[in-house]
């Protein structure tokens, strides 16, 4: 069984390059539809503007497996443990929706409140 998922994607460190790169990773694994890219100012800290977009695709991965896959991509792209909270990011991939699933646990927050 597959589920339709939605991700948010953001970067403010060399964002054009990093968004292009994350699209390559995602396109290798899924048939992805992307929104337009939009710019937002950094909030809660002093930093460069973010480039953001949303994407959707169908997956047979369960939510925890997909979350792990997304974390692997972030790590491959150079995201480090100190790039959390309100800080600059090489790449930020957030699972916004996973089908009709509602999960509020330590591992999952779906639908995402971010």
PLM region spans:
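Short, surface-exposed acidic-centric catalytic microdomains
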Residues: 17, 21-63
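Glycine-/small-residue-rich active-site loops that bind phosphorylated ligands and cofactors
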Residues: 14
């Amino acid at each position: 069984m597959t589920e339709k998922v939605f991700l948010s994607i953001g970067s403010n460190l060399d964002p054009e390059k990093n968004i292009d790169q994350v699209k390559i990773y995602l396109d290798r694994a899924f048939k992805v539809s992307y929104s337009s890219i939009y710019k937002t100012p950094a909030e809660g800290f002093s930093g460069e503007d973010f480039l953001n977009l949303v994407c959707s695709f169908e997956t047979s991965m369960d939510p925890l497996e997909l979350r792990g896959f997304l974390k692997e991509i972030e790590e491959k792209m150079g995201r480090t443990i100190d790039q959390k909270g309100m800080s600059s990011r090489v790449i930020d991939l957030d699972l916004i929706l996973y089908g009709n699933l509602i999960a509020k646990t330590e591992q999952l927050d779906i639908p995402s409140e971010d």
